[in-house]
Amino acid sequence: MKVELVASTENAEIIIERAMRICHGGDVDPEKGANKTFIQNIIKLGHESPLEHGVMTFKIMDVSRSLTHQLVRHRIASYTQKSQRYCKEDQFGYVIPPEIEKNETFKTEFINMCKKINDLYTYLTLSGVKREDARYILPNACFTDIWVTMNFRELRSFFKLRCDKHAQWEIRNLAKEMLRIAYSKYPIVFEDLYNVFLLNDFKVEV
């Protein structure tokens, strides 16, 4: 799994504070920077709509299609995914679940099955079967890449659900990596979630 921050809102925390203060007829001097206490108190009160003015775009690579099936359920976001209809999938990479990987017998069978699927996929496409039809035999473990754009409010909702210990392991790993990146970029907005889900995992330079 690889996660890359492609783009994000410049001066997002100042923009968010200004949006928060306009609700009360006020404004803020951008030269002074964002007021951490003010923003975090407003978030604690549940007034999160101003967070929608901040946006992050991530490039996510080498994850399973099982993961992306879960990811796209978070609907207040924009997604663009590698297409198995147009892209060749011969010699596809795949994710091996830890529960299978730790058992050598299961792991060997898993790898052999993926090789058989790859061989059949290659045979079908070389025999004239269209990729859009040959792809039906590909496993959920197959690597895929996806771009994701979420506003800060939706990101916070995503992190609360998917960083939780009850979330499925692969999307939990993704969510934690995205949170690490989000916190390093915007510590005021994401500090509370970092402290809950990542503080004991590793430290982030901010």
Task: List each language-model region with its residue ranges.
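Family-specific signature for flavin-dependent thymidylate synthase
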Residues: 1-206
